[in-house]
Amino acid sequence: DLHVYLGCEFHANMEMLPMLREQKVMTMAGSRYVLTEFSHNSEESYIRERLGALLSGGYKPIMAHIERYEATRNSLDFVEELADMGVYMQINADSITGKDGFFTKRYCNKIMKDGLLHFVGSDCHNSAKRSCRIGEAYRMVSAKFGQDYADELFIHNPAEILK
C-alpha cells in the first residue's frame, strides 16, 4: 500500500507561531515537525531567532535545503550551533548527486561527513524540470558513507516524523 502524507516548506516569517497554532499552514504529516525555509541571504541572527521560536513553541524545525543559504554555506559552526539547539538539517537529493554543481556537492559531503544531516528531500516539483533523483542520492550516500547512514537519512529519520 502507498500512503501519502501532506507537508510542505514553510517560509520563515514573524507570524510563524500564530499561523501554526491556527493551522493556517501545515506541518509535516500533521506532526510537530516543520520544514522551514529561509531566503538565501537571511542573516544568522534571523535564522537563529526564527528556529528558536519554533523550538520554544514545541515544534521540531527542519531547516530546508541548508546548502542554499549563505549563512549555512559560509559557516559549518553555525550549522553545528543550530543542530545543537535541536534543529534538524535537510538537503536536496540533486545537491548530493552533483546536479546543483561541484561546490554544492562538496559542501553536502562535508555536512554528511560531520554528521550534521538528518533528512534528504527530493525537491520534486514535476517530472519534467525537477524529476526525482532520491534513489540515485541514496545509492551515492550508501557508497560513500555506508548503508546504515543512508538508511538513517532516507528511511529511519523520515519514519520518525510519522510516529
Provide a role label for each language-model segment.
Residues Y107:
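Catalytic cores of alpha/beta
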Residues H11-N13, R68-T72, I96-K99, H125-K129:
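Active-site environment of divalent metal-dependent phosphoester hydrolases
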Residues L116-C132:
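Short acidic/histidine-rich active-site segments
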Residues D1-Q90:
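Extended substrate/RNA-proximal surfaces in nucleic-acid metabolism proteins
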Residues I134, Y138-K163:
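Mid-to-C-terminal alpha-helical segments outside catalytic/metal-binding sites
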Residues H65, D123, P158:
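Conserved, mostly hydrophobic/aromatic
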Residues G101-T104, G146-Q147:
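Glycine-centered helix-coil hinge/cap
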Residues Y88-I91, I96-G98:
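Aromatic-anchored helix/helix-loop segment that forms the rim or "lid"
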